[in-house]
C-alpha cells in the first residue's frame, strides 16, 4: 500500500514538472523571437536552468 501511494505521488510531480517544462519552452521561444541576436545565449541559459530544476527534486530525494 505504501508503495502505491509513493508511485502516485511520483506521477503527480512528473505531470507538474512536464507542465513547467512546456511553460519554459514557450517562454524560450518567445524570448528567442524577440531577441534573435541573443537567442543562443538565452537558450544556453534556459537549458542550464531547466537541467538544474530537473535535477533538484531527485537530488533532494536522494539526500
From Swiss-Prot:
Membrane-traversing stretches: 21-43
Cellular component GO terms, alphabetical: host cell plasma membrane; membrane
Record keywords, A-Z: Cytolysis, Host cell inner membrane, Host cell lysis by virus, Host cell membrane, Host cell outer membrane, Host membrane, Membrane, Transmembrane, Transmembrane helix, Viral release from host cell
UniProt subcellular location: Host cell inner membrane; Host cell outer membrane
GO terms (BP aspect): killing of cells of another organism
Coarse class of the protein's main subcellular location: host cell
Statement: the UniProt record of this protein carries the keyword Transmembrane: yes
InterPro entries the record matches: Phage_MS2_lysis
Pfam family, one: Phage_MS2_lysis
Membrane topology: Single-pass membrane protein
Entry's family note: Belongs to the Leviviricetes lysis protein family.
Role: Induces the formation of specific membrane adhesion sites between the inner and outer membranes, apparently leading to host cell lysis. Lysis may be performed via activation of host murein hydrolases.
Protein name: Lysis protein
Amino acid at each position: 500500500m505504501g508503495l502505491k501511494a509513493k508511485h502516485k505521488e511520483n506521477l503527480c510531480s512528473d505531470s507538474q514538472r512536464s507542465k513547467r517544462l512546456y511553460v519554459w519552452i514557450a517562454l524560450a521561444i518567445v524570448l528567442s523571437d524577440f531577441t534573435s541576436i541573443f537567442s543562443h545565449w538565452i537558450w544556453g541559459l534556459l537549458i542550464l536552468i531547466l537541467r538544474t530544476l530537473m535535477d533538484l527534486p531527485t537530488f533532494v530525494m536522494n539526500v
